[in-house]
Amino acid sequence: MMKTEATVSQPTAPAGSPLMQVSGALIGIIALILAAAWVIKRMGFAPKGNSVRGLKVSASASLGPRERVVIVEVENARLVLGVTASQINLLHTLPPAENDTEAPVAPPADFQNMMKSLLKRSGRS
């Protein structure tokens, strides 16, 4: 009598493990988000300035690697502050600025015009 053995083939594992596939997708999504943030910042859609309600930094000058003189507008006064890495000192108090001398606020950029100018610059019309 002859014995025959049946061979059972094991399913082969996919080329990449599920952990590697998920990791690759996550890295791709993060790279896409960073690229979109860079484009938004580069094209000028990001909000300008870091003014807080009632508080606005109107001027700033660097005196050294960690020292600055800053003019801050608060309600009815302008404060001249000395800012270092470890402390902030009030140097002087100025009267409020006149509204006439305030710089005009630029209107928000129009996406269509910005895209046209970008395409013209790159040579694609």
Swiss-Prot record:
InterPro entries: Flagellar_biosynth_FliO, FliO/MopB. Keywords: Bacterial flagellum, Cell membrane, Chemotaxis, Flagellar rotation, Membrane, Transmembrane, Transmembrane helix. It comes from the Bacteria. It holds the Pfam family FliO. The chain crosses the membrane at residues 20-40. Coiled coil: none annotated. It is found in: Cell membrane; Bacterial flagellum basal body. The keyword Ligase does not apply. One of its GO terms (cellular component) is plasma membrane. GO terms for biological process: archaeal or bacterial-type flagellum-dependent cell motility; bacterial-type flagellum organization; chemotaxis. It is a single-pass membrane protein. Belongs to the FliO/MopB family. This is Flagellar protein FliO.
